[in-house]
UniProtKB/Swiss-Prot annotation:
Complex formation: Part of the 30S ribosomal subunit. Contacts proteins S4 and S8.
SUPFAM superfamilies: dsRNA-binding domain-like (SSF54768), Ribosomal protein S5 domain 2-like (SSF54211)
Record key words, sorted: Ribonucleoprotein, Ribosomal protein, RNA-binding, rRNA-binding
Lineage: Bacteria, Pseudomonadati, Bacteroidota, Flavobacteriia, Flavobacteriales
Domain of life where this protein originates: Bacteria
Entry's Gene Ontology BP terms: translation
Record-linked Pfam families: Ribosomal_S5, Ribosomal_S5_C
Functional summary from the UniProt entry: With S4 and S12 plays an important role in translational accuracy.
Domain S5 DRBM as annotated: residue spans: 18-81
Protein name: Small ribosomal subunit protein uS5
Length: 174
């Protein structure tokens, strides 16, 4: 699912204490010649609140089944996100479909300044201080995927230093 991103560390769910957050449930309709067939679509974010997070989509005729399918899908898509002292290592933008998300690191004590779907993802990752802005589409599916796009582009200072072949001091001081 995350093949387009470099340096993505996939994580197995075994041994992790994962908490799931329901982002949204939508009732969907399929119109057939015999009438309307109703179903449900659920999007869920799971994480250990310590840098590991995953998102999943589940569909079923029943709400509970859709949610449980979404949780199982999310556990299959776990990735590790680099964090720095309870916030993000640097500013990052992400996009998916019509949704655009901007994430900014914040000083300690700021809290999570985010709404709806972005908040659920950031809480599941374990970020405590961050500023965010959602632009464009507010569709929860697209916003979650745009947030993941931004998070998967994050790189720690150690990773940047290793890729550039310089010391950590050189990364920070230029």
């Amino acid at each position: 699912m995350y093949q387009d991103y470099k340096n993505v560390e996939h994580v197995k769910p075994g041994g992790l204490e994962l908490k799931d957050r329901l982002v949204g449930v939508q009732r969907v309709t399929k119109v057939t010649k015999g009438g309307r067939a109703f179903g449900f679509s659920a999007i869920v974010v799971v994480g250990d609140e310590n840098g590991v997070v995953g998102q999943g989509l589940g569909k079923s005729k029943e709400v509970a089944d859709a949610i449980s399918k979404a949780v199982e899908d999310a556990k299959k898509n776990l990735v590790r996100i680099p964090l720095h002292k309870g916030t993000l290592p640097h500013e990052q933008k992400g996009k998916y479909g019509g949704a655009r998300v901007m994430l900014l690191p914040a000083a300690a004590g700021t809290g999570i300044i985010a709404g709806g779907a972005i908040r659920a993802v950031l809480e599941s990752v374990g970020v405590h201080d961050v500023l965010s802005k959602n632009q464009g589409s507010s569709n929860p599916h697209n916003v979650v995927k745009a947030t993941f796009d931004a998070l998967l582009q994050l790189r720690s200072a150690e990773t940047v230093a290793k890729q550039r072949g310089v010391s950590l001091e050189k990364v920070f001081k230029g």
